[in-house]
């Protein structure tokens, strides 16, 4: 069911849960949001800090960020706070919802997330309130009638899959109409923390803690110098800090989505949300071939080393690792085929041609000689 912002706001008022978004002089207490924002939109090539996915050069050629703060320094938000953020974003021009958060409960079905109820979770009786307002507001944000970009019929929502090592995506990311992002480390293997399995759509770099002397395996991005965070900086500079998680993987994908939307506009193309997301999810690099044997992982929740059976991740990290270049080529309409340098490859061109059309291929003399 799709709702209007007036209907959703009406429910908020009737239930006494109305929460108006407002700009307040409050610091990003954890640095989490600032770190995520830097991955997407830090200015590139200025000799400072880090480069980002879609930040541009500082000449009005990069992504624009809208901040909708829902946590207020805590690690949770109410159903109404989340709903208000999506309505505000949709009504004020946002075309991508970058959502590095999710529900920590073992929710495995859409109805559990939306309507709540009483469930048996991990052997315990748990009562969940559900998130009907958030779901309705998210659908409002995604409604093609509320699209905020000329190259898209419907906005895009990207979520972190979750950091609980669970064999399914957390919600709202597991919903079928959004993108849930898993995380891999610098070794191209799953981060030991990442969720995986049903609901997960695509993977991206999320970093991984190795030891106290080697933070470089994590993701470096913008920080808040006076934030109450434990993340390490560079040489004491906490304006740039290391973090790990699907929260860091998520903005890599959101940044690539932003590049794709911008490129589609440049080419004068328009896509439905389903078409656009399909191009994204098929423009990937294969991961499963790496998932053999075991991996040593340092669990920050128990402060101990453990071994991961990598086979359990096969086919469960999403379609593959996000690839910005492949995605932009797909938007352009240019097929991409990866091959090893110095190796020969046979390509079945029937996969790329209409069998009812005629094609003429001209090969110059130099190419003929090279081909033998």
For the regions a protein language model found, what residue spans apply to each?
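Catalytic-core segments of hydrolase enzymes
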Residues: 36, 95-223, 281-284
């Amino acid at each position: 069911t799709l709702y209007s912002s007036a209907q959703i706001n009406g429910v908020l008022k009737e239930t006494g849960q109305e929460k108006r978004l407002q700009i307040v002089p409050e610091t990003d207490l954890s640095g989490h949001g600032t770190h995520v924002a830097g991955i997407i939109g830090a200015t590139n090539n200025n000799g400072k800090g880090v480069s980002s996915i879609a930040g541009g050069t500082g000449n009005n050629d990069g992504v624009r960020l809208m901040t909708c703060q829902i946590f207020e320094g805590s690690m949770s938000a109410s159903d109404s706070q989340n709903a208000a953020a999506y309505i505000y974003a949709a009504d004020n021009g946002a075309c991508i919802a970058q959502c590095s958060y999710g529900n920590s409960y073992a929710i495995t079905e859409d109805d559990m997330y939306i309507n709540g109820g009483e469930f048996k979770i991990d052997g315990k009786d748990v009562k969940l309130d559900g998130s009907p307002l958030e779901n309705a507001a998210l659908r409002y944000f995604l409604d093609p009638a509320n699209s905020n970009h000329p190259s898209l019929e419907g906005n895009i929502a990207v979520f972190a899959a979750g950091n609980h090592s669970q064999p399914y995506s957390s919600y709202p990311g597991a919903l079928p109409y959004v993108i849930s992002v898993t995380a891999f480390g610098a070794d191209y293997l799953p981060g030991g923390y990442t969720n995986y399995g049903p609901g997960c759509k695509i993977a991206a770099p999320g970093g991984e803690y190795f030891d106290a002397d080697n933070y470089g395996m994590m993701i470096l991005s913008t920080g808040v110098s006076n934030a109450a965070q434990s993340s390490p900086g560079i040489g004491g500079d906490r304006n740039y800090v290391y973090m790990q998680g699907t929260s860091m993987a998520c903005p890599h994908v959101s940044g690539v989505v932003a590049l794709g939307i911008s490129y589609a506009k440049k080419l004068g193309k328009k896509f439905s949300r389903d078409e656009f997301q399909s191009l994204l999810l098929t423009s990937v690099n294969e991961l499963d071939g790496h998932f053999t044997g075991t991996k040593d992982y340092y669990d920050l929740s128990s402060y101990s080393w453990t071994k991961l059976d990598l086979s359990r991740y096969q086919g469960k990290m999403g379609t593959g690792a996000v690839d910005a270049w492949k995605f932009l080529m797909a938007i352009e309409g240019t097929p991409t085929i990866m091959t090893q340098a110095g190796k020969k490859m046979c390509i079945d061109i029937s996969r790329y041609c209409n069998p009812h059309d005629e094609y003429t291929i001209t090969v110059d003399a130099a190419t003929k000689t090279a081909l033998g």
